Amino acid sequence: MNGEHSMATPGESCAGLRVWNQTEQEPVAYHLLNLCFLRAAGSWVPPMYLWVLGPIYLLYIHRHGCCYLRMSRLFKIKMVLGFALILLYTFNAAVPLWRIHRGMPQAPELLIHPTVWLTTMSFATFLIHMERKKGVRASGLLFGYWLLCCLVPAIDTVQQASAGSFRQEPLHHLATYLCLSLVVAELVLSCLVDQPPFFSEDSKPLNPCPEAEASFPSKAMFWWASGLLWKGYRKLLGPKDLWSLERENSSEELVSQLEREWRRNFSELPGHKGHSGMGTPETEAFLQPERSQRGPLLRAIWRVFRSTFLLGTLSLVISDAFRFAVPKLLSLFLEFMGDLESSAWTGWLLAVLMFLSACLQTLFEQQYMYRVKVLQMRLRTAITGLVYRKVLVLSSGSRKSSAAGDVVNLVSVDVQRLVESILHLNGLWLLFLWIIVCFVYLWQLLGPSALTAVAVFLSLLPLNFFITKKRSFHQEEQMRQKASRARLTSSMLRTVRTIKSHGWECAFLERLLHIRGQELGALKTSAFLFSVSLVSFQVSTFLVALVVFAVHTLVAEDNAMDAEKAFVTLTVLSILNKAQAFLPFSVHCLVQARVSFDRLAAFLCLEEVDPNGMVLSPSRCSSKDRISIHNGTFAWSQESPPCLHGINLTVPQGCLLAVVGPVGAGKSSLLSALLGELLKVEGSVSIEGSVAYVPQEAWVQNTSVVENVCFRQELDLPWLQEVLEACALGSDVASFPAGVHTPVGEQGMNLSGGQKQRLSLARAVYRRAAVYLMDDPLAALDAHVSQEVFKQVIGPSGLLQGTTRILVTHTLHVLPQADQILVLANGTIAEMGSYQDLLHRNGALVGLLDGARQPAGEGEGEAHAAATSDDLGGFSGGGTPTRRPERPRPSDAAPVKGSTSEAQMEPSLDDVEVTGLTAGEDSVQYGRVKSATYLSYLRAVGTPLCTYTLFLFLCQQVASFCQGYWLSLWADDPVVDGKQMHSALRGSIFGLLGCLQAIGLFASMAAVFLGGARASCLLFRSLLWDVARSPIGFFERTPVGNLLNRFSKETDIVDVDIPDKMRTLLTYAFGLLEVGLAVSMATPLAIVAILPLMLLYAGFQSLYVATCCQLRRLESASYSSVCSHLAETFQGSQVVRAFQAQGPFTAQHDALMDENQRISFPRLVADRWLAANLELLGNGLVFVAATCAVLSKAHLSAGLAGFSVSAALQVTQTLQWVVRSWTDLENSMVAVERVQDYVHTPKEAPWRLPSSAAQPLWPCGGQIEFRDFGLRHRPELPMAVQGVSLKIHAGEKVGIVGRTGAGKSSLTWGLLRLQEATEGGIWIDGVPITDMGLHTLRSRITIIPQDPVLFPGSLRMNLDLLQENTDEGIWAALETVQLKAFVTSLPGQLQYECSGQGDDLSVGQKQLLCLARALLRKTQILILDEATASVDPGTEIQMQAALERWFAQCTVLLIAHRLRSVMNCARVLVMDEGQVAESGSPAQLLAQKGLFYRLAQESGLA
């Protein structure tokens, strides 16, 4: 470093500087280890380093710099030391000039070196100044520079001190010592961090990430994360303990960049349609895209993230350079060990160089991993955000082709697989580069014999690519089966009440397990091929070694197998082995990623809502018409036929327009067209002013009442109170434990159906919009509540008076109150006008009213104004009827935190008091995974298979050890006349051991994968059984999202991750045993270093596992919130768009994703912290093994020395991967904990009992007797039904009525044993229902619920789930419900596939299909639980006529809101507060003028 020094030590010549002018052939070691060469390299490398990287660094900080730093004491000291070094080198350059001036000749380098270092030190000092100006607090560039600068002064200091020539040249010594002191001081100061900038552009977060405050060594080693790891080791981590998210990692920043590039790329595609970009017909289901659409998305991802990826790739390339330096250094080291005359310092230097090379390889590799992991995190955030934004703009046709479960599966599985593939992208080219470099090394070692290695390797490549191709086919098959299973599971969990009511659990379990069996079959085949692929690469490595050694010893002239050839070849082959083992895994991951990427790209290309489908303009006071449609023709999608034709409609300001028509006429489609949800084929649609929308099926969010009503609007308490009172929610909210702040639960699980509908209406009213579009908001309400809500809100004197209202309704009694009535039929406007005008026309409206007329008992001359006593006389009583607060219910229709489709309102539990229960949070376990979890998994694998697997791993590892040791013996064989005597024998046994190892490796890996598949099958069956056997209360308390997480994400981990982590752990653990034995046998002294290193490893592992397991669990729970919000938005996207609330919803998604990022980032940093520190500790073992070999050189053979050091070079990676594999396995084992969460939950009664089989014809008559019956829905709630004693005769038709909360539905639940009796009991035909199995009981009773439920699958499957009827019987049932013509028109007829839950059918059509399903069951007892509440009166007449014909001899229980429905019953039960208040015929009850009479008055029947 010092320019004064000569190129050799004082008194020692450099042989005329032969380093620079060498003509004689010398050994390689001479060139690389000559002190003159090392000193020359040390003199020129630091300046070259700084002058090459410095300008690039200056440009970077100029573009990315922030506020300047204050002139701190640290900066001042750095500058003073810099100027001191400048003065020193000025002096060193001046001395030779002075001597030349005095006539003393000087070597040119004595002047050149100080001059170069003078300019370099000046540049370094300038960089210190510029870093302060640009706000750089810790410099990695200068840290590396000062570190390099220490090399030559340190060597010179040692040599000069040992030479003892201070008196001869004191000035030279002092300059060298001063130079070293100053450089070391600069190095120490560069490890410190400067003060923060004077003025910060961003406000400082509460808990900033310590990376910004860390020094360069701390950043390189990830020591800045140690505080969080120590905190996680000492206590449970909470949100406050996690670091705040940096802006560059936030969702808002990342998604906006990717979306911008995605839109730009998509708009450049030929055939792009212009609006929004997306026009793929929805019939191309995104799960199975027919053509690749990945191009635009791939280009967008590359443009956004390429800089991070390329920088990481550069780090990886540098790391690999040091990786391949190790075999070269090992070759030099073994050359040193074989040369008895070489000096000892050469061995020490080589040991240090091997250690430094291994350390630099570790540091650069971990920097690559860190950057790629951060890139993965950012990419996951960006793509998830892109999917969420796509959900907000999906067209109605696209939504029908992709259920919420598919979308959530897309985010939770496909996005994850895509981001994981980023790590393997470089494997496609870099691993091939590894292989080439390895073959070059082999050529240098073994000469032309290495060519045989190329031949062997290339001959095996086609086999491996064939295996990979076959495996990708089975992988795609598994993905298809998995998606099918996810859809069916989601549907089952959403409709579990219907399934249990009918006793269909076994049929669905059989269907689901059949799909699961096909999925596991594909998984087993894929795992088998994966094992073959790995073993084939292992065999190819062994064959390379065998053929190369055989050819070399038998053919080559210099055929002796010495230590250098043997063990350097082994080291090179170990690198080759890693490349060949990692290559199929990389290909496998990329194949998976390609499938997932295609699914993502196809989803992002689905058809969007046309922004030009409806023109929304600000309100103008002068305008008379608020809504206008001119010659409008609309379709659901590009490929479907138009559903509305020739619509011409004008709605003036302040008008109440009622839209009526038969089922399937297009009423809801008209509102969708006005909202811009339908594809506009021709015409125009315009709306003036803001819009509020009330959907037919209520959609509420998992928030409080007030947040649902305000819906991102500012809180106005007086207006909120007025809205709640008008919507008949005031008394309900007052009864809630937290008032308006009471959480409603997921999908309103704490509310009844009527409450949810009124809450949905209140949300629209609170909006104070100019235009209101309401899709049958009164259908789910009791008659008196319906009247009240209409009068207070919708009607002429309601809160919405003066606004423009379009009301789609089946409630015909409101029609006289409407300003205009529009009648739709077959997608066209049949007629439009005022109520009186349409009556006089005697057209379509009159036909509707006639269809709703009572079948009998009304004279021909009755005026149409009183066409239906219930429907049209609703306002005759005058005044607002009094009503009690409707009691909320727990619902099984909670939205799925992983998957749900259209919200379904199951039969209302109208008598459960609210208890303030919120949606259940997903369980999060803390601490280490319990040993019982491992034991349960191993029991699922099976003890014999576990023992057999361990034995196989031991056998193959013994074969591996013997193979390496046999090679060391071969290398030590004496050489006679240039040949070894036993080469053939050595080669034959070497080949035999390699074959045994390959066989054992395949058998052991196949055993692990087969055991994993067996365990996965049993655990899934157990989870499915535990959930299916749970009572209905379990589903009311457990959000479906939590269940879907177990059935999707956690099951995927058990299927794939755990077997793979188990295989990795066993491979490395047994490999560690082999390495430990090898090192201990060759150099026993190394054991002294191994033991403390093992203690340090244990300490690092304890810190890491305690924190990482917590972070993993927190991350899983937080990601559930992201999935839940995504599913919730998918269900309510039409409402969100109608309210123009896309912005707030996007912001909420970004906030949830950012919270998940706050957990993901510390977890990936903890991974790097572990890897970097453990590998550095392992690199220390390399140094110990090498130094032990140097110390034992006198009595250690070259073969044993090579065996020791080459084994030590492997232990670093092996030890690190043992810890990582164990930790990954423990993290994955959390999934086993979670799938076993429901093992100990209460289960319902047995499905089948032996006593049931003895009565196959039960019940014969259908007599039902309640004896002092009572039940409560949960232990903490009051009795919902109590003291009910009555007998219903066989064949009797009994109506059950009562106000909301009276206990009507609870009676039927008790009859079906959905809720077990708390007191008393129920007898059917004299047999207690508790003596019958649940399936026996439920299969003998038919229930038609209020809301129709269909399942994914064919129409025939939906009608005859148990396949008990012929096609003729099914067609007869369809003809009875007047659906035969409709089904005949469907493609495939009975084999027509219902999408989702029959989303492509109208509510009325679905209800008629459910009726046909009931007709086919042919049971003696029929329950209609509000079955006609959601259909128009005409459909209701059809249903009643069919029921009267098919169930004339059956016992019928009819629960009804519409009293008209029970007027033909032989007896009516009036429920009040859980008891039977009145019982008798309708005429008797009306004559008593009791509760039934009051209800009839409210309905206009009395």
Swiss-Prot record:
Pfam families hit by this protein: ABC_membrane, ABC_tran
Chain segments carrying region Disordered: 854-909
Location of the ABC transporter domain: 627-851, 1264-1498
Gene that this sequence comes from: Abcc6
Subcellular location: Basolateral cell membrane; Cell membrane; Lateral cell membrane; Basal cell membrane
Name of the protein in its database record: ATP-binding cassette sub-family C member 6
UniProtKB keywords: ATP-binding, Cell membrane, Glycoprotein, Membrane, Nucleotide-binding, Phosphoprotein, Repeat, Translocase, Transmembrane, Transmembrane helix, Transport
Enzyme class (EC, first level): translocase
Protein source organism: Rattus norvegicus (Rat)
Job description of the protein: ATP-dependent transporter of the ATP-binding cassette (ABC) family that actively extrudes physiological compounds, and xenobiotics from cells. Mediates ATP-dependent transport of glutathione conjugates such as leukotriene-c4 (LTC4) and N-ethylmaleimide S-glutathione (NEM-GS) (in vitro). Also transports an anionic cyclopentapeptide endothelin antagonist, BQ-123. May contribute to regulate the transport of organic compounds in testes across the blood-testis-barrier. Mediates the release of nucleoside triphosphates, predominantly ATP, into the circulation, where it is rapidly converted into AMP and the mineralization inhibitor inorganic pyrophosphate (PPi) by the ecto-enzyme ectonucleotide pyrophosphatase phosphodiesterase 1 (ENPP1), therefore playing a role in PPi homeostasis.
ABC transmembrane type-1 domain residues: 309-592, 946-1227
Membrane topology (Cytoplasmic): 59-78, 126-137, 195-300, 369-424, 470-531, 596-938, 1018-1060, 1104-1174, 1219-1502
Family that this chain belongs to: Belongs to the ABC transporter superfamily. ABCC family. Conjugate transporter (TC 3.A.1.208) subfamily.
Post-translational modification: Glycosylated.
